[in-house]
Amino acid sequence: MTKPNARVKVGNIIFSNEMPLSLIAGPCQMESRDHAFEMAGRIKTMTDQLGIGFVYKSSYDKANRTSLSAARGIGLEKAMAIFSDLKKEFDCPILTDVHTEEQCTIVSSTVDILQIPAFLCRQTDLLVAAAKTGCVVNIKKGQFLAPWDMENVLKKVVHSGNPNVMLCERGTSFGYNRLISDMRSLPILRSFGAPVIFDATHSVQEPGGQGASSGGQRQFVEVLARAAVSVGVAGIFLETHQDPDHAPSDGPNMIKIDDLQRLIETLMEFDDLSKKLN
């Protein structure tokens, strides 16, 4: 029976719960070519200086926005061309979400990691389609699932012939418009054998908390990120923007890009200590 790979290679980066931390970062949604290049360039320069592996993330379509009138992104066709150019310019892998089986084939021709959104993490046909592309698959744990429920989700991808899968913790529903991060989830997810990612920015989201959009508590991103890295993870997922308060989506939980380097430096120190002790 196929098992998940404990080490997942993406370009020159290896995601492993036992190896140094890697970073998945970028703005919530792709806004324009110029904005994508600005964000990727700034993060790439920083991560090269710090010596941490970097995967650029952004969404071409925010398909689960709270309101019908909310901005969703620039669309699949435009985004794929920009992602291709970003890879050539900055030599970094790309992660983006897929929402349908048909998107998996299209996106996998350009992108390195297919991300399964939390709300869709039990959709068998989507998971199988993502698995069959051969791309690395990052599955976000649904806010409605216990960590041990993710073992069966993981098996849907692995038993479809793709052992290169990662599990991402992004918080659990805790009453209305609230999420909580239970750090016990991380060792439980690790026990299934796949690399574990902690999404520190969506974990402070307040889903639908502003009526027509989601709120968030940006001030707690670092607290949760420190805790997760201390427990031990393969990677940290952070959404960032030069002006989060005016971003088209998820602004309240994104961190300012000007604050990113200090945060990553801190997390790398916690990661180094945690993995030495373990």
Curated annotation (Swiss-Prot):
Q: What is this protein called?
A: 2-dehydro-3-deoxyphosphooctonate aldolase
Q: What is its EC number?
A: 2.5.1.55
Q: Name one GO molecular function term.
A: 3-deoxy-8-phosphooctulonate synthase activity
Origin, by domain of life? Answer: Bacteria
Record-linked InterPro entries? Aldolase_TIM, DAHP1/KDSA, KDO8P_synthase
Tell me the compartments it is located in. Cytoplasm
This chain's source organism reads Bartonella tribocorum (strain CIP 105476 / IBS 506)
Top enzyme class:
transferase
Gene Ontology BP terms: keto-3-deoxy-D-manno-octulosonic acid biosynthetic process
Question: What family does this chain come from, according to its entry?
Answer: Belongs to the KdsA family.
In terms of SUPFAM superfamilies, this protein maps to: Aldolase
Q: Which GO terms describe its cellular component?
A: cytoplasm
| Catalyzed reactions | D-arabinose 5-phosphate + phosphoenolpyruvate + H2O = 3-deoxy-alpha-D-manno-2-octulosonate-8-phosphate + phosphate
Pathway listed:
Carbohydrate biosynthesis; 3-deoxy-D-manno-octulosonate biosynthesis; 3-deoxy-D-manno-octulosonate from D-ribulose 5-phosphate: step 2/3; Bacterial outer membrane biogenesis; lipopolysaccharide biosynthesis
Keywords carried by this UniProt record: Cytoplasm, Lipopolysaccharide biosynthesis, Transferase
